[in-house]
């Protein structure tokens, strides 16, 4: 009789632990942020100029003497007033009704008497379909975030992006913003509403065990896709 040699208990437990850890690591599907551009930018170093020996220095890296505080260079900051309120409603309905009736008789030969003297045939059918559907969505997002000018387009528009992180209890909250700002829409308080930003991307996400508990695992997604009910 051939003897089967089993692995020692310790290696078996180690292999099982590694398998469970691998499945646990695959339970959460990583989500890529919708904003892929850099969140900040460093302003270029100004060219060194010889000091003129007066109070006004044209080579000063700050603002000129007669210029407002609106951003216009890479590295300048801007406050975004997030005021998004989107409502959408959709409804649809369909109703169809169709009926049909057919009746005809087939005479037979005379020598076929009894039940076969005359054959009658009739057919009737009806088809009815009624369906209704509706959907509604409402999203509101209010807040403020300060972003950095990461690029200046040839027409003068500013490409901005920024990120705000907040660690609250056991969760890390992220607010990311990016878009293209027209300098003419910037107020004197160095702020602009998000509704006036082109190509705006606003992302609010979190990391932590609460977010992981609210995320469906990959195995659940698999059975959800193949389940016929």
UniProtKB/Swiss-Prot annotation:
One of its GO terms (cellular component) is bacterial-type flagellum basal body, distal rod, L ring. Its main location: membrane. Transmembrane segments: none annotated. A lipid is attached at residue 26 (S-diacylglycerol cysteine). A lipid is attached at residue 26 (N-palmitoyl cysteine). The keyword tRNA processing does not apply. Residues 1-25 form the signal peptide. GO terms for molecular function: cytoskeletal motor activity. It is a lipid-anchor. One of its GO terms (biological process) is bacterial-type flagellum-dependent cell motility. Assembles around the rod to form the L-ring and probably protects the motor/basal body from shearing forces during rotation. The basal body constitutes a major portion of the flagellar organelle and consists of four rings (L,P,S, and M) mounted on a central rod. PANTHER family: FLAGELLAR L-RING PROTEIN. This is Flagellar L-ring protein. It comes from Burkholderia ambifaria (strain ATCC BAA-244 / DSM 16087 / CCUG 44356 / LMG 19182 / AMMD). The lineage of its organism: Bacteria, Pseudomonadati, Pseudomonadota, Betaproteobacteria, Burkholderiales.
């Amino acid at each position: 009789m051939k003897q089967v040699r089993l692995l020692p208990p310790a290696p078996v437990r180690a292999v099982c632990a590694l398998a469970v850890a691998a499945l646990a690591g695959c339970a959460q599907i990583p989500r890529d942020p919708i904003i892929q551009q850099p969140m900040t930018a460093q302003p270029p170093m100004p060219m060194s100029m010889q000091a003129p020996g007066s109070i006004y220095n044209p080579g000063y890296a700050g603002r000129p003497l007669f210029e407002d505080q609106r951003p216009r260079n890479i590295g300048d900051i801007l406050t975004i007033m997030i005021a998004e309120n989107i409502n959408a409603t959709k409804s649809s309905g369909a109703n169809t009704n169709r009926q049909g009736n057919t009746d005809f008789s087939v005479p037979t030969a005379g020598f076929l008497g009894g039940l076969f003297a005359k054959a009658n045939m009739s057919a009737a059918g009806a088809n009815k379909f009624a369906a209704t559907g509706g959907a509604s969505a409402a999203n509101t997002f209010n807040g403020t975030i300060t972003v950095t000018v990461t690029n200046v387009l040839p027409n003068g528009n500013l490409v901005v992006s920024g990120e705000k992180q907040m660690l609250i209890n056991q969760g890390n909250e992220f607010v990311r913003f990016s878009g293209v700002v027209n300098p003419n829409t910037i107020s004197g308080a160095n702020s602009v509403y998000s509704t006036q930003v082109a190509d705006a991307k606003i992302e609010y996400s979190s990391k932590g065990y609460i977010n992981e508990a609210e995320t469906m695992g990959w195995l659940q997604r698999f059975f959800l896709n193949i389940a016929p009910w």
